[in-house]
């Protein structure tokens, strides 16, 4: 694959006309992202909606600026994100209506964007398109959110962020995870990769570390599981693997509360990062060459 040119705009500004909004508009044309769009194209602008009451998401003005230029090129943009894989107290985008409420909380609405704001994988996160990835290192297929897969062009509008699996998230993570349906997220998190005896995605359990009912978060842990596979009593935690659908809610809840009774296996992370790149390739394969542009803040 040929090396791609990367443009950089300094965030420093001596006056208001040098702020990030006009710089983003200038960069849109300097990087020739306008050439991705033909008149009448349906254009997915893939962002991250953020999580409820958290501030690590793009400012709406930065997204609206790109929407305006896509429309100026004759495109028909829509701003989108997907539902999350996990169902737990720290996630506010597990289903479509909650995702849109979170988007509105952060200023991503049709009124502020000047275009529709949609959940690309549908209300339940199961609206997808299966895509073969022949060159994938680990994954040979991806399940791309339908609204993205059916778009004519895409602007991948990312921002730098931390991520518990990827460590660092940018443009690859924004579509490698954020461009997948729930089924795609299960797949790329390696929940069902390998033989049942060595699924890398299965949680590593250390029941001897569980405080049982003495843990102040034991009710939160139980409530985090949408399948009732996780139960805590005075003897500690009990896990029913047959009920588990590998949404990682128990692991993330336990880890985020500072405990390590349910964690990822040590060798999980490098493989998951490779799978994420394979999944991102799957998203790219749904578009014709030259129909995707990437921009990161």
Features from the language model and the residues they span:
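Extended, low-polarity segments enriched in aliphatic/aromatic residues
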Residues: 2-62, 68-69, 73-80, 86-297
